[in-house]
């Protein structure tokens, strides 16, 4: 479990989320055919953050389970799982959250063993993943992309385009360069 900028209450909260879904895996989901037995429950990369464009503060990370991988948003709480924050989304209701330059639809949910949270489905079912390491690598890359500065330049996806005339006449000039 990767955590940053966390105090004891927040670490306990993420651990509590993991424990709640471990219990669900062992009970409600135990014999369901959409479960990938090569995977386990893991909360990954939770950090305190604010969505961009003046959104609310909260904690965001990814929850990997044998049946889904979800982006999870935890609304602020009072002292160590105390009072619910007014920004908690009712179960089944949706809201849009912006991270970087991307909008995501989150759905309000609640588990008796944990309490309220919001999720955005990334993968379900999880049969695309051969093992926990591949699911973790995908989750880590998703978080890296979401947390990248919106102003950061994108990495090049292919070699620069060569000028066709230059190619035909043996010049090595790349389009946009001066001779």
From Swiss-Prot:
Gene3D superfamilies noted in UniProt: [NiFe]-hydrogenase assembly chaperone, HybE
Keyword Cell inner membrane in annotation: no
Keywords: Plasmid
Highest taxon, organism lineage: Bacteria
Record InterPro entries: NiFe-hyd_HybE, NiFe-hyd_HybE_sf
Parts forming coiled coils: none
Protein name per its UniProtKB record: Protein HoxT
Species name: Cupriavidus necator (strain ATCC 17699 / DSM 428 / KCTC 22496 / NCIMB 10442 / H16 / Stanier 337)
Gene that produces this protein: hoxT
